[in-house]
Amino acid sequence: MSFRNPILSLAAVLVFVSLLVPQQSAAQNSTNAYMIDEGWAKLPNGRMMGAVGKAKVDPDGRHIWAVIRCDAGQDRFGSECLDSDLDPVLKFDPDGNVVESFGSGLFIWPHGIDVDSDGNVWVTDAVSDNNIPAGDDRGHHVIKFSSTGEVLMILGTPGEQGDGPNNFTSPSDVAIASNGDVFIADGHNANGNNRVVKYNSRGEYLMSWGGTGYAPGEFRALHAIAIDPDGRVFVGDRSKSRIQIFDQEGNHSATWTQ
């Protein structure tokens, strides 16, 4: 995941920083002053920290969920979990200890994550088609897990890219609305589907919007998606270096640029 268009809560951004950069302090103008805690995340059994796809705060407000790619080697970029037995979905307590992990063998390139109000964890696999071995039924899908790792739902057709209602092409991210509706950023590649796909809480297709381009409502590489407390849908449009804002029916309301 690129950090050029972060559509994340402040807490999740702080987790990224604490995992990836040296210790330093930052003065704040608000009462919520904070300091970076170097080495906060403690991976078990000597595991090396791979790339962090995304992090989210648990509904309890204390724990942090993160997608951490399995292999820390730079030469594996794009397929870090292809042949790994490591879990890419990890839950950390406030002290940075892993208290839950799962997802081994289910992803090739886990990318986005969200946690719904019931504590279920949603994870996307944004692997590109040329990184999926022949016959492998992973990639181009989104998995809903219980908080203990039980697979509850799969959206998309694993291992098969496409642009229909039951297919994605390298879905980058997922966001769950307060009513349970599911919004998928589809997807990671600039020349891919470039759309937002919406499902209800049962996984039934409702609608999609977008298309490849630079006009309002069009995208070039959707890289992140989030929903604010007012229900607005924020989409990180990476190749255009902008954030587009929509209502939940796909109506464009604003664009933020760098």
Where do the model's predicted regions map?
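Eukaryotic scaffold repeat domains enriched in small/polar residues
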Residues: 24-258
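Bacterial N-terminal signal peptides
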Residues: 9-19
